[in-house]
Amino acid sequence: MDCIEVRGFYSSTEEQNPEQQADISENISSLFSLKEQQKMSEYSGLASNHSQMIAEDSEIQPKPEHSPEVLQEDIEMSSGSSGNDFSGNETNENYSSGHDSHGHESDENGKDSAMLMESSDCHKSSSSNAFSLMIANSEHNQSSSGCSSEQSTKAKTQKELLKTLQELKAHLPAEKRIKGKSSVLTTLKYALKSIKQVKANEEYYQLLMINESQPSGLNVSSYTVEEVETITSEYIMKNADMFAVAVSLITGKIVYISDQAAAILRCKRSYFKNAKFVELLAPQDVSVFYTSTTPYRLPSWNICSRAESSTQDCMEEKSFFCRISAGKERENEICYHPFRMTPYLIKVQDPEVAEDQLCCVLLAEKVHSGYEAPRIPPDKRIFTTTHTPTCLFQDVDERAVPLLGYLPQDLIGTPVLVHLHPNDRPLMLAIHKKILQYGGQPFDYSPIRFCTRNGDYITMDTSWSSFINPWSRKVSFIIGRHKVRTGPLNEDVFAAPNYTEDRILHPSVQEITEQIYRLLLQPVHNSGSSGYGSLGSNGSHEHLMSVASSSDSTGNNNDDTQKDKTISQDARKVKTKGQHIFTENKGKLEYKREPSAEKQNGPGGQVKDVIGKDTTATAAPKNVATEELAWKEQPVYSYQQISCLDSVIRYLESCNVPGTAKRKCEPSSSVNSSVHEQKASVNAIQPLGDSTVLKSSGKSSGPPVVGAHLTSLALPGKPESVVSLTSQCSYSSTIVHVGDKKPQPELEMIEDGPSGAEVLDTQLPAPPPSSTHVNQEKESFKKLGLTKEVLAVHTQKEEQSFLNKFKEIKRFNIFQSHCNYYLQDKPKGRPGERGGRGQRNGTSGMDQPWKKSGKNRKSKRIKPQESSDSTTSGTKFPHRFPLQGLNTTAWSPSDTSQASYSAMSFPTVMPAYPLPVFPAAAGTVPPAPETSVSGFNQLPDSGNTCSMQPSQFSAPLMTPVVALVLPNYVYPEMNNSLPQTLYHSQANFPTHPAFSSQTVFPAQPPFTTPSPFPQQAFFPMQPFHYNPPAEIEKVPVTETRNEPSRSCTPQSVGPQDQASPPLFQSRCSSPLNLLQLEENTKTVESGAPAGLHGALNEEGTIGKIMTTDAGSGKGSLPAESPMDAQNSDALSMSSVLLDILLQEDACSGTGSASSGSGVSAAAESLGSGSNGCDMSGSRTGSSETSHTSKYFGSIDSSENHHKTKMKAEIEESEHFIKYVLQDPIWLLMANTDDTVMMTYQLPSRDLETVLKEDKLKLKQMQKLQPKFTEDQKRELIEVHPWIQQGGLPKTVANSECIFCEDNIQSNFYTSYDEEIHEMDLNEMIEDSGENNLVPLSQVNEEQT
């Protein structure tokens, strides 16, 4: 056995005297030197050669018997556990590794290696000999033959080998050492790994440069080495701890390094010659260096070398941190210092190579401990970190480097708890519980101790926050803002730690981490916004959420949690049981549960209450608490959530589904009738009911409960793109007009219901529980939460499956209640109206309005306003009933913006006169007299912002200004300085629903501010003669505001109207009237510059009244006499009035939802005034004035049947046409010329402003004019000889910097800033003797 022979050899050498041992060593060396001449092909004979070698060696010396003691010593010397005793254990480790590298040529070798690795002691006397034997054998594998006289050389080689190995061991990271000592095997493996990594990176770098053809080098400046030295010297000369180095991105070698580097890195300057920069880096930082110096990511040096750029600006480029070797502090131990590296991309002209080589210039600044002089001030010792729910560092602020001693790459991806003091780790669980409780809001907690790199602890005060995923409402990551309170004992945080043992995860660390992870799986139920940009970060969202949450939850969070739990269980049951049954049961259950007071609110409120009660009754086990949190959050809506919800709804609406399926909703009465049945089965159905409740209730509608199994939601196209998470305020921007796939009816129902109620609820954060109506309204918000769940479905596949069921339930239950509720002309943001929802549910005609014939019908949702509650302050709103045939969307709360009380538009209204407000007319005309007329006297009840008494009309012409307006035009904003005008004849308006047939409005007194309305006399007072059918019981109350109101026309709304249906965008009462309105608008516009335009359509329907800000004209056109409208057929008469009222109501209700964006309308109606609508105060803001919005879109005003679907975007008009052909209502619309449609969407622009902007852009572009090359100049001279005489301006032809002082000549550049068309060559160039020079513009044309 080879192993026995080796041991015999070891024992024999031990027994020899020193002289004999020396001879033996020489003989062995000579044998191995001969073996070095063997070729690599002899590997196959390694085992036999090895045996032969041992035999030969043993023949030289007599073979004594193997002493067990000596054998044991020899074996023990190879333990490898002793890092310091290199000659012993390391030698044997090399021996074993050498054989391992060759695959253990023989079993004996393998056994021998195993035996050698077992022992723990070393024998120094024999280790050197054994080392030489093993090194030669393992490295060279040569046969045993011949001798050599190179003993001295071999001895030196052995010493060098030992020294190199010791130095190599110094590079081994502490975490790879065993008990603080480096083993040879581990060191060699680590060295091999590092070499491979460096080589791979170099190859990748070269491949990258070849493949990309140096794309980033196109605009990179080229410098010589001397120029690089000159440029960088100005940055480093003032800082003794800073040096500059240029590294070739092709070869990785140092092209240039500043003189300071030798002093800072404590080495000779010659050391850097032809050296690769990565060789100076700590092995663990090599990958960071390569990643951070990717060519296409580097900024070009000329970016920061401009005169206007300061040194500080350049240093603020993205930097990274690396450790660079800086000599040896102790023998065999390399010292690394951290440096902040700021990279730039340049080209360096290499004299040895023809082409310039792409290089990276690095400004390296040594980083010192923040606790050593010059110290970082205590109040500046602040840094931030983020970590994941699994407690792994995700990001570390670079400010932490001098404070913690760790580089960012050292911490990222490592457990947070490992770096904390063991006694402080349990605090992290409590902190994360509070994070979940605060829902993104920052908070402070008790200090924690953090271990720095040198092993000492610092004490930090931390402000914790989190980012809440707006889709799943779960914590995405946790943010900590740390301030160091107490520094470490050892101020040098970069010093090596005193201990070397590995940081092994303590069992408590793993346990706490798991608890935190499970905790953060729960959705955040708190409505608070994320302090760092998650939901509600805009502030207004937070307010909305907080308000809604307080009232929705009714202060009982437990109920919500229980609801959520039940919901999760119900979701599973829903799968097993019929969805329809489930939804029906749910609807009944909801109704029954709803308290009588909430019944008043209507199905929306009922559902909410029912859910609360039902879910509490059926509270699920506590293990569902996490789910509850998810659901709970939903009742509280942020703008962002609502927007997402709206987008989903629009997506569903866009799907091609029969209108009947979409509109199918049972009357609220039917729901009530089924209440008893449902109640009977409440217990059995509870899980289902809960799930239904979930679907119907806002809370339950929140993101699916953790652990709840959800089926995938089959949605067309791009549900995930429904909304931008950041577009929280821009409601219209979130609207998505989606494709043609057929959505499921329930989805569509959801979309419809929420569209009205959602917008309402979201728009109006319910006012404080001062009024039950407000609370009820907030409950509606909860229902909207169901749609929010739909959003969650997009991001969570498990939720998708649940949504399908949810959609059905929502459609039948919530949707019915919502539909009834919305159809009943609930003002979009009025909490009080919710109180009347229950009553409205019973109103007849609900079904009809809900049926939608338009397949593409898109209900416009109003952007949730800041807080409807704040505006309404708990006031009651008159009950509004939907008109039969009226577009459902128009009646949706979003449509009936708080501005529903806005000025009522009358066909013959004088454009410039403010309209009287009818106190009771908050809603549009009810479809039938049966609808209780809120009555003019009900104005106070309406609780609308219209607090004015019937006699008092607050803002003349503000929103109330009425004019027959062609949808195309924007009208000038009414002067808010105008005095409030009162109609003295207001008494003429009877409180009873019907208008007196001959009611006449007395002439309006002239406005105090004549400037906006100079032609007031021009408009004679025209009495309104209305003989409305008895069915018209309500007249919208027109509330004027003192503030000027900009009509909420789609134009004024801007992009927001894009969400509205095509008809609404067209702003035509019917498709037939589109062209007529177009013509009328033209005539009216030409007739007068008046800001108000009125026109009657042929059918006698009064054009929608709208006031818009016109940049210029303030005059108003006289409207056609009211008699014309009256002369039209009876249907047209009622329809006209209906249209006006509906228009008034819907537009105001929508807050220009149709006119601009249903979403923006909400904001406008809530008083944001974004549209210029004066909605904030009265909610009747200019949204009323945007009469052109929805009802212009309504299809047939004469029939009063508005079966239109809002067109979300003009770009989708083609998509819209696809469905238009399927519905007769849209046939005419489909054939309408695109130019006509476009006319209604062009925003007004100030000519002067536009020209000014264009001129500014032209000036900027002028400086970027191309310059001629020499070849081009020669060609031009051949064609245009005058150019050679200096006719071409230098601004065009000059190839040098025209801004340099040396190049500026007299008046060459004086005219450079002038418009191009104004520049003439005669003025710009010196006399060239050429009298026929052409203007520069002409020259430019020739050049092009």
From Swiss-Prot:
Residues 445-488 form the PAC domain. Residues 852-862 have a biased composition (Basic residues). Its main location: nucleus. A motif (LXXLL) lies at residues 358-362, 1138-1142. GO terms for cellular component: cytoplasm; nucleus. Keywords: Biological rhythms, Cytoplasm, Nucleus, Repeat, Transcription, Transcription regulation. Pfam families: bHLH_PER, PAS_3, Per3-like_PAS-A, Period_C. This is Period circadian protein homolog 2. It comes from Gallus gallus. The gene is PER2.
